[in-house]
Amino acid sequence: RKMSNHYIVNYPDHPKRTESALYRQTRKKLKFMPCFICDRVNVEGEQSNEIHHFYIEKVAASAIDWIKFGEFAQECFHLQTGENIGKKFDWKEVEKNPEIFVDSPENMIVLCKKHHTGRIGIHHVPFPDWILQKFAVKDFQFVVGET
């Protein structure tokens, strides 16, 4: 079935996105972790896997109720490591400086370009359809891009 979605996302006013020191540390720490969907790994000297802000996009940080999110996060686990994310943070401190969480490894998943920003990536495919790609039987494609 062919499907098309059109919608408008309303983000709060925010400064131009820059890479924080924490983001750079996070990217370095995760660079050899495999793609969450297809298990593709980077090889030495290559950086084709990327990190994706999973729970909270950086541009949305100023419009998040961090105390409410912190309560929710107590029961959340990182998709790739299985570690609880909520207990690692002082959410009152995150409320003062959201970057503490937003650019941390706990808010990131590692994706290859195809499953991140490609036609079948998380930035283009609704999550319920995107996640199916992780569990497909061999040689079956749930999301095929444009036909």
Feature names for model-found ranges:
Residues 60-66, 70-147:
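Polybasic, low-complexity binding patches
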Residues 20-85, 112-114:
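Short cysteine-rich loop/turn motifs with clustered Cys
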